[in-house]
Amino acid sequence: MANYDASSINKSKKAVRTYRDLDLDFTRHPVTNDVVKIEDVNAVKRSVRNLVNTQFYERPFHPELGCGVRDLLFENFTPMTGIFIRRKIEEVLVNYEPRANISSIAVNEDADRNGINVEVNFYVLNLPNPVSVTTTLKRIR
């Protein structure tokens, strides 16, 4: 049985789709004085991090877009709280980030820093390497 990959079958020069987003740090490009663009894996990682940190009704004209994990941060951390956070993160990423195929989500309590560490492992479409995004959720009053 022969092994074929996409580049040997597809004769086009560009077989992989690139993803571009604006850099939300609004850094200025030194030559064009425009906002710098982030590409490929960095764009998807930024999008995943933003979706996890977004609350419902936070984005104008999109009240349905959000994760809602900040509501669970004021509860006592139990194994069920970790499961609820994992489910909310998985739900928002499946619904609003089609570029990422989730492989695992790890939720760990950080009692010393009063936060919860979340690690999302996923594959970007058309790329073979796994990608990991780690963020810390903290209680903000």
Which residues fall in each region the model found?
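Short secondary-structure junctions
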Residues: V94-I102
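Immediate N-terminus of the mature polypeptide
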Residues: M1-R87, E91, S103, N108-R141
